[in-house]
From Swiss-Prot:
It is found in: Virion; Host nucleus. Encapsidates the viral genome into characteristic twinned ('geminate') particles. Binds the genomic viral ssDNA and shuttles it into and out of the cell nucleus. Plays a role in protection of the genome from degradation, virus acquisition and transmission by insect vectors, infectivity, and systemic movement. The CP of monopartite geminiviruses is absolutely essential for virus movement. A motif (Nuclear localization signal) lies at residues 40-54. It holds the Pfam family Gemini_coat. This is Capsid protein. Coiled coil: none annotated. Belongs to the geminiviridae capsid protein family.
């Protein structure tokens, strides 16, 4: 089958009429579309699904977790923390019950991902001392929360009280699971001083959190799967400050 010609020229004795067959307005001239330079890396990362391996097609996670419904809601927690050698804990799954875009509708919701952004920094009196201090972050799931969050020393077993060797105690392994572990380092001294370090982590979780009938966003109102962020620095005498913004992206459950 022959291709349709781009245009047809109809010749008459009086005039020549050029008829266009692209069905657009005859009064608009053709404007050249701006060309965007695409690199090989962008072409490879944005390739269609049929060009990816079978694993990407079979085990592709859905946008909305199973058993949940949209829209995607966001809850942020901003605070400055004094991180010591003995550790500190904050609850990052505190969500108030309500009808807003930052509230949970009922008792159950699924935390799809969490975004930790901020920095750790030293005081003016500490940064001139020759030392290296590393802050260890542990994102922990508490399967059976009750009362108040347990301290760092109660959950983790550290050799010689060193947070870098922290592991969950044997009798608490069924209750606490470390979902992600990361760290950031600052260095003090007159030379090669690094008084602050950035913290930027995006973590995919898909953790189903269950509350009781209360509306307040508190740890004691959790009944299942509370998310806790434990922090501890490796230096015993020099504390570190952490200015963090923790954002959780969650979906409401259909069982509410």
């Amino acid at each position: 089958m022959a291709k349709r010609p781009a245009d047809i020229v109809i010749s008459t004795p009086a005039s020549k009429v050029r008829r266009r067959l692209n069905f657009d307005s005859p009064y608009t001239g053709r404007v050249a579309a701006p060309t965007v330079r695409v690199t090989r890396r962008q072409m490879w990362s944005n390739r269609p699904m049929y060009r990816k391996p079978m694993m990407y097609r079979m085990y592709r996670s859905p946008d909305v977790p199973r058993g949940c419904e949209g829209p995607c809601k966001v809850q942020s927690c901003e605070a400055r923390h004094d991180v010591s050698h003995t550790g500190k804990v904050i609850c990052v799954s505190d969500v108030t019950r309500g009808n807003g875009i930052t509230h949970r509708v009922g008792k159950r919701f699924c935390v799809k991902s969490i975004y930790v952004i901020g920095k750790i920094w030293m005081d003016e009196n500490i940064k001139f001392k020759n030392h290296t201090n590393t802050v260890m972050f542990f994102l922990v799931r508490d399967r059976r929360p009750s009362g108040t969050p347990m301290d760092f020393q109660q959950v983790f077993n550290c050799y010689d009280n060193e947070p870098s060797t922290a592991t969950v105690k044997n009798d608490l392994r069924d209750r606490f699971q470390v979902r992600r572990k990361f760290y950031s380092t600052v260095t003090g001294g007159q030379y090669a001083c690094k008084e602050q370090a950035l913290v930027k982590r995006f973590i995919r979780l898909n953790t189903h959190v269950v509350y009781n009938h209360q509306e307040q966003a508190k740890y004691e109102n959790h009944t299942e799967n509370a998310l806790l962020l434990y922090m501890a620095c490796t230096h015993a005498s020099n504390p570190v400050y952490a200015t963090l913004k923790v954002r959780i992206y969650f979906y409401d459950s259909q069982m509410n």
